[in-house]
């Protein structure tokens, strides 16, 4: 197996190690919540760091020192502002390199190398088959970065014009992590493009001719999942509006419709499906991106678990057939 293709399966670089560590941390947090109550950590800070919004309020009484580090949950919009600007810039650099042959900026190239990217190989040493594979991967990277930017832009729109935020809070550590998260995700996507020095492996003159079934399927899954997530957010928003669309309260109600008929956190399920659609776009065998998906799975599952417990403890009439995150399973 040649060059970067072989390295794809064998190297645990700093980027992969980071995603693996994040996934393991959220898996551990989830397992602790599923364990018997006597085994749960009593540390208020631990509980404060893994909860946000309504689930933070529904837990045990929080010490004043924890409340001092609260920031409004509506600051979620800041995450998407950062993502639109940062990942839009990365998309611009990638487009310039793919279609015009412009090299990446020195700082970006150095950052990718620091993260331990394995996609660097001298072009002259690659076979024709490897060059074709490189073009497919370049197209996958371009499409996934477009998906990430479109996703962030839609979520930013929803934060401003759809969502109705209550006065709940997130911890300042969660806020800082959210700001860094989309920067890291964008770099993870960009790191998958094959490069020779500061130039992208495959120029984009005939890039679209490299489209394969997984590119098309991934695109279809992305828009399908995004449409469901948007619908779920509209459903949640309408719980706090009257028929004219005017916000009348910020209380919590039981959501019905779309994937909410199956799970309590349908929007989190849609988020997972969006990331899986990106894994499909990468051809289903990109180890690095599957580590990202694994992190998303456990982080969303943890939040969904808290949501589900909140709904069940708050509403006596809550549908008993609903699961927390995965239909019919969990």
Curated annotation (Swiss-Prot):
GO terms for biological process: dolichol biosynthetic process; dolichol metabolic process; dolichol-linked oligosaccharide biosynthetic process; polyprenol catabolic process. Expressed in the 2 tissues tested i.e. testis and liver. Pathway: Protein modification; protein glycosylation. Residues 38-89, 158-169, 228-277 are lumenal. It catalyses: a di-trans,poly-cis-dolichal + NADP(+) = a di-trans,poly-cis-polyprenal + NADPH + H(+); a 3-oxo-5alpha-steroid + NADP(+) = a 3-oxo-Delta(4)-steroid + NADPH + H(+); androst-4-ene-3,17-dione + NADPH + H(+) = 5alpha-androstan-3,17-dione + NADP(+); 17beta-hydroxy-5alpha-androstan-3-one + NADP(+) = testosterone + NADPH + H(+). Its EC number is 1.3.1.94, 1.3.1.22. Belongs to the steroid 5-alpha reductase family. Polyprenal reductase subfamily. This is Polyprenal reductase. It is found in: Endoplasmic reticulum membrane. It is a multi-pass membrane protein. Keywords: Endoplasmic reticulum, Lipid metabolism, Membrane, NADP, Oxidoreductase, Transmembrane, Transmembrane helix. InterPro entries: 3-oxo-5_a-steroid_4-DH_C, Dfg10/SRD5A3. It comes from Rattus norvegicus. GO terms for molecular function: 3-oxo-5-alpha-steroid 4-dehydrogenase (NADP+) activity; oxidoreductase activity, acting on the CH-CH group of donors, NAD or NADP as acceptor; polyprenal reductase activity; polyprenol reductase activity. It is an enzyme of class 1 (oxidoreductase). PANTHER family: DFG10 PROTEIN, POLYPRENOL REDUCTASE. Plays a key role in early steps of protein N-linked glycosylation by being involved in the conversion of polyprenol into dolichol. Acts as a polyprenal reductase that mediates the reduction of polyprenal into dolichal in a NADP-dependent mechanism. Dolichols are required for the synthesis of dolichol-linked monosaccharides and the oligosaccharide precursor used for N-glycosylation. Also able to convert testosterone (T) into 5-alpha-dihydrotestosterone (DHT).
């Amino acid at each position: 197996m040649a060059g970067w293709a072989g390295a794809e399966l064998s190297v645990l670089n700093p980027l992969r190690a980071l995603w693996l560590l994040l996934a393991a941390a959220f898996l551990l947090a989830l397992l602790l919540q599923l364990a018997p109550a006597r085994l749960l950590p009593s540390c208020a800070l631990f509980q404060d760091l893994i909860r946000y919004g309504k689930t933070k309020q529904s837990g045990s009484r929080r010490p004043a020192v924890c409340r001092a580090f609260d920031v409004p949950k509506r600051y979620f919009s800041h995450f998407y502002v950062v993502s639109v600007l940062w990942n839009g810039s990365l998309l611009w650099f990638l487009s310039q390199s793919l279609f015009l042959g412009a090299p990446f900026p020195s700082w970006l190239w150095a950052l990718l190398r620091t993260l331990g990217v394995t996609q660097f190989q001298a072009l002259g040493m690659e076979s024709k088959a490897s060059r074709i594979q490189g073009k497919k991967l370049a197209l996958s990277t371009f499409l996934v970065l477009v998906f990430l930017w479109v996703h962030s832009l839609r979520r930013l729109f929803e934060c401003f014009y759809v969502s109705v935020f209550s006065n709940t809070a997130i911890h300042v550590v969660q806020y800082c992590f959210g700001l860094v998260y989309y920067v890291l995700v964008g770099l993870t996507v960009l790191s998958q493009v094959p490069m020779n020095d500061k130039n992208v492996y495959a120029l984009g003159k005939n890039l679209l001719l490299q489209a394969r079934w997984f590119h098309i399927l991934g695109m279809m899954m992305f828009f399908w999942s995004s449409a469901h997530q948007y619908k779920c957010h509209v459903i949640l928003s309408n719980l706090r509006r009257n028929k004219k669309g005017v916000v009348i309260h910020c209380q919590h109600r039981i959501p019905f419709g779309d994937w909410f008929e199956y799970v309590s956190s349908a929007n989190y399920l849609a988020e997972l499906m969006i990331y899986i659609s990106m894994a499909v776009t990468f051809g289903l065998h990109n180890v690095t991106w599957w580590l990202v998906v694994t992190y998303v799975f456990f982080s969303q599952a943890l939040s969904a678990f808290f949501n589900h417990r909140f709904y069940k403890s708050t509403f006596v009439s809550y549908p008993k057939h609903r699961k927390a995150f995965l239909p019919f399973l969990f």
